[in-house]
Amino acid sequence: GITHFDLANNYGNPYNGSAEENFGRILDRGMREFRDELCISTKAGYEMWDGPYGDRNGSRKYLIASLDQSLRRMKLDYVDIFYHHVFDPDTPLEETAHALDQIVRQGKALYVGISNYNAEQTERMQQLLTELGTPFIANQPSYSMLNRQVEKDGLDQYAVAHGIGLAVFSPLSQGFLTDRYLNGIPTDSRVGRGNTWLGEQLNEELVSKLQQLNTLAERRGQTLSQMALSWCLHNPAVVTVLAGASKKQQIIDNCLLYTSPSPRDRSVS
C-alpha cells in the first residue's frame, strides 16, 4: 500500500496550507490510528505569508514557525521528514542547518532533508549537519525522462556515494509523461485550463517525443506513466518517486507499475 505522503506548507488551492488541512481531515477519517505505519513529510522555504519572515527564506524563525503551523494544520505532534524546500542564498547555510537540527532535537521531526539543492549545496549542507549530528537523509529534486539535471549536476552520484536518498518530484514532468497530451489538449488538463508555462513547452517536438516514448511503453506492456516512473527508479540514487494525481484512477494506474516489468529494469535507461 501507499504509506508515504509528501506535503509542503505552501501546497494547496485556493490558499497556501490548504493541502495540509485536507490531509489532516483525511487522517481523521480512520487513518490516524495507523500513524506509526505512515511516513509523513512536509517542507518550508517558499513564500508563505505576508511580512518579512513569511517570504522565501531559510531562517531559523521562518522554518520553526512554518513547521509549527504545519503540525497544527495536520493535527500532528511530529513529521517523519522535514525538508528545507529551496536553497536560500540570502541566509547563511549554517543558520538553516542549526534550525533543522533544533527541529529534530525538539521532537518535531524524526529526520531532515533538503529540496531543490544542487550537488555542491547538498555537500555543504551534509557537512554542517554531520558536524551537528543531525539525521539528514534525503534531497528532493526534480527528475524525469524530460529533466535530467540531477545527472548533469552529479547529484545522483553524490547521493549514492554519501548515503543520501533522492525523493524525486515531477517524475511525470507535470503530466506530460502520461497519455494526457498524446492526441491533443484535454479541456480538463493543466494546459487546457490555461497554464501558460506548460502550454509554451507543449510544442510539436515534445508531442512527437511523447508519442515515441508511448510506443516504447506499449512494447513493454506498460503505460507511459508507468514507464516514466520505472525509468526514475532505475537510478540507484532514487529511493522514491513523488507523483501527484488529480483523479483516483491515476493513482491506481501508477500503482500497477509493480505488476508490470521490474521498476528497476534498466532497459529504459
Predicted regions and their residues:
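N-terminal binding-site loop/beta-alpha segment at the start of enzyme catalytic domains
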Residues: G1-L38, R105
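Hydrophobic residues in well-ordered beta-strands that form the structural core
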Residues: D6-L7, S41-T42, I114, V168
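Glycine-centered flexible beta-alpha turn that most often forms the glycine-rich phosphate-binding loop
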Residues: F5, V79, V112
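Active-site mouth loops of central-metabolism enzymes
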Residues: D50-K61
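Short, acidic/polar
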Residues: S59-R72
